[in-house]
């Protein structure tokens, strides 16, 4: 559920809803490359963690060390997290528990551009590269272009890469919306390959029976490697799957690069209607940055929504996106309300078709209560569940009691300056790291320390006080009068 919220937070419209016919990709000989990225989140301000590209003859994969940490949804999706050992930050795989070799963002982008130029150099007759990606909401081209824009590498990128193509629109045109509902990239690949696999299995059924015995033994040995190789959360795996889906959508039985010129022409003809030039994507990126500024202006209005339940947070995100895409800002709506009050807000929102009638009513009431100083800002009503937090505390307590030694050892070494610390939220006591000062032993709330024995007085040992009490009871000491201190007198010498 967290992943859905963070995905909706991206202020981008549905992917490739319209194709600009003025900037159409010209006919030519192009190299198709599947591309995908792993990011720290689903916002334009997030960073790339892994950049991957695939062709049947060569592929590119590089992990990037981000400045920010991965959010919980990204960590769960990509199985990667940021750890800190001392003053060094690094990436660690949550599957293999090994440190991942990474580079800086600018170094990884330079290697990526060199790899693309090498592909073009190997085929002098080519006209450029067409990148394939698969997403329902357009995000990958924006992230790649935003990263290149920071270092002034867009012109060099545009000389090699000519267009981006979303294979989701290709699948939508061939299969329809009903078949693509809740259909991920792997499920789509299996759906397209199902008919071809069934026909191939019927023809080669005797051979498959003889090979089952030897293949089963290898599957047990290479089980972990296969799970890692087919992990859909990795950009390297998804880039390969994107390329294979594009071939399957063109009714090609092959899962590798077509060799004949006729097959290349058929593949390009299938891709061309959905291709958009890089220049148009750059203009869209600029528009999305402007929408982000409009969306951020509505944060004070929906502050109470983000402090409540998941339902209201998703609803607030939807309202902010719709208002920003329609060109509204908080200042413009305030000017409308100042002039015509609530009726002006209703007229301004009537032309928005993406909102239902009850949603428009709720939004108008919320804006009116925010702008009117005599009214209190509307707070969404919800029923808190008293059993939920209690069960979580018990579950966390049981887990911490069983795995206390292991968790304390791992967190103390892997969570530090700038590392991911969200896993320590369920612990009762904070885990010390390089950014926090560890408390002294005398101030801890654990078992009290035993005092040292003092052998100089009678109260040092455990039996000392008892002996003193018996002596005082048997024969109490008589009171002593103060003794006068005599002063020394000088003696005179006589003859």
UniProtKB/Swiss-Prot annotation:
Keywords: Developmental protein, RNA-binding. Residues 207-216, 398-414 have a biased composition (Polar residues). GO terms for molecular function: protein homodimerization activity; RNA binding. Residues 197-217, 377-495 are annotated as: Disordered. The keyword Ligase does not apply. Ensures the proper localization of the mRNA of the bicoid gene to the anterior regions of the oocyte thus playing a fundamental role in the establishment of the polarity of the oocyte. May bind the bcd mRNA. This is Maternal protein exuperantia-1. It comes from Drosophila pseudoobscura pseudoobscura (Fruit fly).
């Amino acid at each position: 559920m967290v992943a859905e919220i963070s995905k909706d937070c991206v202020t981008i419209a549905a992917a490739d809803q319209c194709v600009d016919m003025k900037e159409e990709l010209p006919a030519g000989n192009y190299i198709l490359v599947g591309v995908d990225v792993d990011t720290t989140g689903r916002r334009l301000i997030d960073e790339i963690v892994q950049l991957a590209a695939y062709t049947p003859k060569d592929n590119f994969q590089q992990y990037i060390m981000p400045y920010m940490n991965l959010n919980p949804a990204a960590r769960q999706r990509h199985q990667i997290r940021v750890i800190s050992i001392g003053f060094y930050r690094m990436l660690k795989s949550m599957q293999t528990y090994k440190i991942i070799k990474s580079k800086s963002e600018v170094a990884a982008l330079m290697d990526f551009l060199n790899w693309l130029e090498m592909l073009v150099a190997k085929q002098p007759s080519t006209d450029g590269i067409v990148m394939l990606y698969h997403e329902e909401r357009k995000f990958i081209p924006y992230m790649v272009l935003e990263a290149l824009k920071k270092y002034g590498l867009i012109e060099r990128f545009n000389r090699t890469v000519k267009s981006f193509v979303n294979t989701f629109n290709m699948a939508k045109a061939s299969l329809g919306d009903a078949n693509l509902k809740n259909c991920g990239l792997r499920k789509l690949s299996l759906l397209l390959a199902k008919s071809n696999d069934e026909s191939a299995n019927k023809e080669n059924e005797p051979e498959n029976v003889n090979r089952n015995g030897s293949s089963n033994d290898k599957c047990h040995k290479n089980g972990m490697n296969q799970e890692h190789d087919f992990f859909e959360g990795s950009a390297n795996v998804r880039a390969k799957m994107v390329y294979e889906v594009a071939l399957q959508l063109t009714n090609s039985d092959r899962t590798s690069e077509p060799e004949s010129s006729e097959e290349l022409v058929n593949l390009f003809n299938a891709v061309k209607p959905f291709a958009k030039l890089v220049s148009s994507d750059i203009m869209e990126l600029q528009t999305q940055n402007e929408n982000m500024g409009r969306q951020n202006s509505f944060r004070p209005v929906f502050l109470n929504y983000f402090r409540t339940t998941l339902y209201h947070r998703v609803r607030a995100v939807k309202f902010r996106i719709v208002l920003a895409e329609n060109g509204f800002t908080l200042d413009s709506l305030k000017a409308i309300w100042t002039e015509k009050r609530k009726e002006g807000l209703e007229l301004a929102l009537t032309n928005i078709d993406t909102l239902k009638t009850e949603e428009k009513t709720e939004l108008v009431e919320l804006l009116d209560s925010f702008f009117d100083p005599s009214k209190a800002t509307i707070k969404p009503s919800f029923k808190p569940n008293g059993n939920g937090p209690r069960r979580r505390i018990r579950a966390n307590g049981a887990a911490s009691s069983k795995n206390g030694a292991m968790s304390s050892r791992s967190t103390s070494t892997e969570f530090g300056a700038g590392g991911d610390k969200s896993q320590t939220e369920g612990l009762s006591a904070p885990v010390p790291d390089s950014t926090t000062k560890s408390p002294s032993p005398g101030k801890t709330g654990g078992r009290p320390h035993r005092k040292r024995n003092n052998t100089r007085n009678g109260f040092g040992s455990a039996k000392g006080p008892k002996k003193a009490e018996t002596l005082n009871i048997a024969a109490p000491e008589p009171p002593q009068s103060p003794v006068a201190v005599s002063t020394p007198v000088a003696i005179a010498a006589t003859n």
